[in-house]
């Protein structure tokens, strides 16, 4: 577990309407007993039990659920060298591959429980799990040749929607040391799959050290600034023993680099205590600090149980908050192109970039605004084309001085045909009241026609819709006729 004490206050971005990750679907997690989190998930969420996180991940830290690429692996799918990113350029940092680049989660051969968490639970064909060969090279880009291309586990999705979280019991093959597991979720209603690589460390990587046992780890999870400090929290049977804490205060920018302070803290521990050691063990009682993750060993018989890492972040960082108002849930298409009339109000200096995409991910409008603390500014975004269907407003908020991404939010809205609704007998204007649709329900669709939900067993498809899964949308979805009868 990692404890962070900080004077920085993080304020959520305030929005005038519901935000959702539209181009977002699912990732390998460990919320309810999953054995290990994916590389992408650890870019956003701390590891269960240790608090470790991946760093310098790029934009996937905001949407680990979106690592989606072409299906058909291994025959097709993402190209070699881009498997971890699913071939998406915005997630290319995931393709970096060295023996010490990523957090590794403990793994054992045998039956293990893998967990997926979904933000949009599509109809599923199957899930497949692959693992690297024992002799793979962890310092080369991930290619098909690194993997055993026969999945060690395959779970059928039965072409049905799974619950929002699923677990798979899989028999993991024997391996040693650092390996990568590739989890593939093949969606059943699109030509896409989701690719999650999982970095794992099998038992046996750390040498057996007589009279010593592993009690923790110094993981270089982030760079620190001058004045910040990192320290150990040592626990025995009675709880935390603060007298045994070792603290390292950062004095220079170079010392604050993650691998450097990890080395220095391990070195300081070894210089102070006889019953605590940190670094790479040689099996003969010698411990050498390294520039990277340093295991912490406790002397057997010392009464010590574990060591955790804490941070004292005293360097203040500016608070940022952005209020966006004026975005409607629905816009009617008229003679003129649709225009979004928004108002932005900033807390903290920031650079804001707004982009409108249609459901095909075409950019239709872009606006860039620099706001000072307290500024309020009207923004007009005229769309390059106005066609019925689902659209997204993507807002990227960056620090105006450094250009670093603070937050990214996606908001949904729809364009509909203009004019008064046609005369006719219908119960809902699609997709209003979606969860209430049953056999015989009549809806006015976005094409201006009226559709009736088919009888059982097809009626269940009528409620299977989301902005990112539109195959059963009446009149326009690829499989709309499976669920609906056109009435006019």
UniProtKB/Swiss-Prot annotation:
Q: Which Pfam families does this chain map to?
A: GbpA_2, GbpA_D3, LPMO_10
InterPro entries in the record: Cellulose/chitin-bd_N (IPR004302), GbpA_2 (IPR041029), GbpA_D3 (IPR054063), GlcNAc-bd_A (IPR020879), GlcNAc_Chitin_IntDeg (IPR051024), Ig_E-set (IPR014756)
Keywords on this record?
Chitin-binding, Secreted, Signal
Ranges where the Chitin-binding type-4 domain occurs: 25-202
Among NCBIfam families, the record links this protein to: PRK13211.1
As for what it does, the entry says: Probably interacts with GlcNAc residues. May promote attachment to both epithelial cell surfaces and chitin.
Protein name, please?
GlcNAc-binding protein A
Q: What gene is this protein a product of?
A: gbpA
């Amino acid at each position: 577990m990692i404890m962070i004490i900080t004077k920085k206050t993080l304020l959520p971005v305030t929005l005038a309407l519901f935000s959702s990750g539209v181009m977002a679907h699912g990732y390998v997690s460990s919320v309810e007993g999953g054995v290990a989190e994916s590389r992408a998930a650890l870019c956003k969420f701390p590891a269960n039990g240790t608090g470790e996180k991946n760093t310098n991940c790029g934009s996937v830290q905001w949407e680990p659920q979106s690592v989606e690429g072409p299906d058909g692996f291994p025959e097709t799918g993402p190209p070699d060298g881009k498997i971890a990113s699913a071939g998406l350029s915005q997630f290319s940092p995931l393709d970096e591959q060295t023996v010490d680049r990523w957090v590794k989660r403990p793994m054992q051969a045998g039956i293990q429980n893998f967990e997926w968490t979904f933000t949009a639970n599509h109809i599923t064909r199957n899930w497949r799990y692959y693992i690297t060969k024992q002799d793979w090279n962890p310092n080369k880009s991930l290619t098909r040749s690194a993997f055993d291309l026969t999945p060690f586990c395959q779970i059928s999705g039965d072409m049905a929607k799974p619950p929002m979280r699923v677990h798979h019991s899989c028999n993991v093959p024997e391996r040693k040391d650092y390996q990568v597991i590739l989890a593939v979720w093949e969606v059943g209603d699109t030509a896409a799959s989701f690719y999650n690589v999982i970095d794992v460390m099998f038992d046996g990587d750390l040498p057996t050290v007589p009279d010593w046992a592993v009690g923790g780890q110094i993981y270089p999870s982030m760079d620190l600034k001058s004045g910040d400090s990192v320290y150990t929290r040592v626990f025995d049977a009675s709880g935390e023993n603060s007298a045994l804490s070792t603290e390292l205060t950062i004095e220079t920018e170079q010392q604050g680099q993650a691998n450097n302070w990890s080395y220095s803290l391990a070195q300081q521990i070894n210089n102070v205590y006889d019953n605590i050691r940190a670094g790479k063990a040689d099996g003969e009682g010698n411990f050498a600090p390294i520039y990277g993750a340093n295991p912490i060993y406790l002397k057997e018989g010392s009464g010590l149980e574990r060591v955790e890492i804490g941070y004292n972040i005293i360097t203040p960082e500016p608070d940022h908050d952005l209020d966006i108002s004026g975005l409607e849930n629905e816009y009617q298409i008229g003679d003129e192109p649709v225009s979004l009339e928004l108002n932005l109000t900033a807390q903290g200096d920031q650079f804001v970039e707004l982009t409108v995409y249609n459901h095909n991910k075409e950019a239709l409008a872009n606006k860039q605004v620099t706001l000072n603390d307290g500024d309020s500014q009207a923004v007009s975004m005229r769309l390059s084309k106005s066609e019925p269907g689902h659209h997204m407003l993507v807002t990227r908020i960056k620090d105006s001085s450094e250009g670093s991404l603070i937050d990214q939010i996606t908001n949904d809205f729809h364009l509909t045909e203009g004019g008064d609704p046609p005369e006719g007998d219908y119960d809902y204007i699609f997709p209003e009241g979606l969860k209430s649709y049953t056999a015989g329900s009549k809806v006015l669709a976005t094409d201006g026609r009226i559709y009736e939900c088919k009888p059982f067993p097809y009626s269940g498809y009528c409620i299977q819709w989301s902005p990112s899964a539109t195959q059963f949308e009446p009149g326009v979805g690829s499989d709309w006729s499976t669920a609906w009868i056109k009435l006019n």
